[in-house]
């Protein structure tokens, strides 16, 4: 699921 990976990247970026 590519969209989940993109979402995780955003979360990590904000983290």
Swiss-Prot record:
Impact upon substituting residue 2 to A: Increases severity of growth defect on galactose upon overexpression
One record GO biological process: regulation of carbohydrate utilization
Gene deletion effect: Cells no longer have growth defect on galactose (upon overexpression).
Molecular functions (GO terms): regulatory RNA binding
Inducing or repressing factors: Higher expression after 5 minutes at 42 and 45 compared to 30 degrees Celsius; at 10 minutes the protein levels are similar at all temperatures (at protein level).
Keywords: Transcription, Transcription regulation
Oligomer and partners: Interacts with DNA-binding transcriptional dual regulator CRP.
Protein function: Plays a role in carbon catabolite repression (CCR), which prevents expression of genes involved in catabolism of nonpreferred carbon sources when glucose is present. Encoded in dual-function Spot 42 sRNA (spf gene), it inhibits CRP-mediated gene activation when cells are grown in glucose, especially at higher than 30 degrees Celsius (when Spot 42 sRNA base pairing may be less efficient). Overexpression of this protein leads to decreased cell growth on non-glucose carbon sources, with particularly poor growth on galactose.
More about this protein: Encoded within the Spot 42 sRNA (gene spf, a dual-function sRNA) which acts both as an sRNA and mRNA.
Stated name of the protein: Small protein SpfP
Lineage: Bacteria, Pseudomonadati, Pseudomonadota, Gammaproteobacteria, Enterobacterales
């Amino acid at each position: 699921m590519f969209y989940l990976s993109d979402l995780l990247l955003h979360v990590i970026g904000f983290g």
